């Protein structure tokens, strides 16, 4: 079987026509016009591109480094302590900002206290009758339970059924009083 294969491969090689080789193309021919003719001066002048200009710019990194040197020098100069142990310029500048922050915090505390006092006074004026009876209304009903109503483990919050019933009864009494007042006015 092996000899038969060798014989078949020899015959196939002999029968195969010899390959026609393509002519070799050069890179300089690919950009030449179709009607290109060689000049008497030879091949040297017309196929070569001009070299790039040698004037290259310095680039961003050069300017960053060139600017960083005086910046670090100035930082060093301003970070040095003053005469007789005085704080340096940067520390003085930061202390000015701290003073502004403290003044802003004091101002915010005063505004918050004024708003809380105004809310307290509003409750005093609105609920003066209830205060005489010893009952003081809440600032807002959600004060009982802050937080999300979802993903809460059982038993985390106190049951508010009695509180809800008190406010429901209060609302119904108020609506009944308004209905009687409207009926009396008609």
Curated annotation (Swiss-Prot):
It catalyses: a ubiquinone + NADH + 5 H(+)(in) = a ubiquinol + NAD(+) + 4 H(+)(out). It is an enzyme of class 7 (translocase). It is found in: Mitochondrion inner membrane. GO terms for cellular component: mitochondrial inner membrane. Residues 26-49 have a biased composition (Basic and acidic residues). Complex I is composed of about 40 different subunits. This is NADH-ubiquinone oxidoreductase 17.8 kDa subunit, mitochondrial.
């Amino acid at each position: 079987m092996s000899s038969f294969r060798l014989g078949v491969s020899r015959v196939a090689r002999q029968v195969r026509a010899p390959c026609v080789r393509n002519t070799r193309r050069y890179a300089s021919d690919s950009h030449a016009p179709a009607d290109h003719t060689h000049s008497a001066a030879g091949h040297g002048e017309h196929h070569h591109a001009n070299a790039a200009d040698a004037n290259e710019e310095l680039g961003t990194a050069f300017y960053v480094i060139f600017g960083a040197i005086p910046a670090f020098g100035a930082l060093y100069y301003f970070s040095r302590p003053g005469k007789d142990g005085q704080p340096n310029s940067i520390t003085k500048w930061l202390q000015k900002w701290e003073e502004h922050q403290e003044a802003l915090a004091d101002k915010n505390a005063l505004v918050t206290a004024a708003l809380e006092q105004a809310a307290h006074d509003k409750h005093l004026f609105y609920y003066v009758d209830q205060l005489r009876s010893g009952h003081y209304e809440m600032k807002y009903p959600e004060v009982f339970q802050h937080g999300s109503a979802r993903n809460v483990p059982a038993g985390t919050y106190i049951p508010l059924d009695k509180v809800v019933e008190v406010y429901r009864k209060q609302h119904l009494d108020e609506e009944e009083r308004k209905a009687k007042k409207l009926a009396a006015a008609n």
